[in-house]
């Protein structure tokens, strides 16, 4: 039988339904950081309802809880690795000299301006 003439047969393979992300005993609250932080992306953004597999009500509660936790500084607004504190580097002599030259130019301009009056 030709490939195009064969009838389409859907496989009868069973599938396992994924468990809901929130169990019945879990309380959606701004103090429950371990629960809330699961629904944030790598950048610290709130994941969508479709990604989280939430109902509309659950998504609204999670969003409000995350926003409250951010305002109370329990969660960061962003999770950027570039802004982590690094070791302080000592100032070089060239930088000090450059700043000193800028100050001298500023003072010279001030004195010239004031001497005109």
Swiss-Prot record:
Location of the region described as Disordered in the Swiss-Prot/TrEMBL record: 86-117
Compartment list: Plastid
Keyword terms: Plastid, Ribonucleoprotein, Ribosomal protein, RNA-binding, rRNA-binding
Classification via InterPro entries: Ribosomal_bS18, Ribosomal_bS18_CS, Ribosomal_bS18_sf
Keyword Hydrolase: no
GO BP terms, alphabetized: translation
A GO molecular function held by the record: structural constituent of ribosome
Similarity section: Belongs to the bacterial ribosomal protein bS18 family.
Known partners and oligomeric status: Part of the 30S ribosomal subunit.
Name used for this protein in its record: Small ribosomal subunit protein bS18c
Gene (UniProt): rps18
């Amino acid at each position: 039988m030709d490939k195009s003439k064969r009838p389409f047969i859907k496989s009868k393979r069973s599938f396992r339904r994924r468990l809901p992300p929130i169990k019945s005993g879990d309380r959606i609250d701004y103090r429950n950081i371990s629960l809330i932080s699961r629904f944030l992306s790598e950048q610290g953004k709130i994941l969508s309802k479709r990604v989280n597999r939430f109902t509309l009500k659950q998504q609204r509660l999670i969003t409000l809880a995350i926003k409250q936790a951010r305002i109370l500084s329990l969660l960061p607004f962003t999770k950027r690795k570039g802004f982590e504190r690094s070791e302080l580097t000592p100032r070089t002599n060239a930088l000090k000299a450059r700043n000193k030259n800028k100050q001298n130019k500023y003072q010279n301009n001030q004195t010239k301006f004031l001497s005109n009056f």
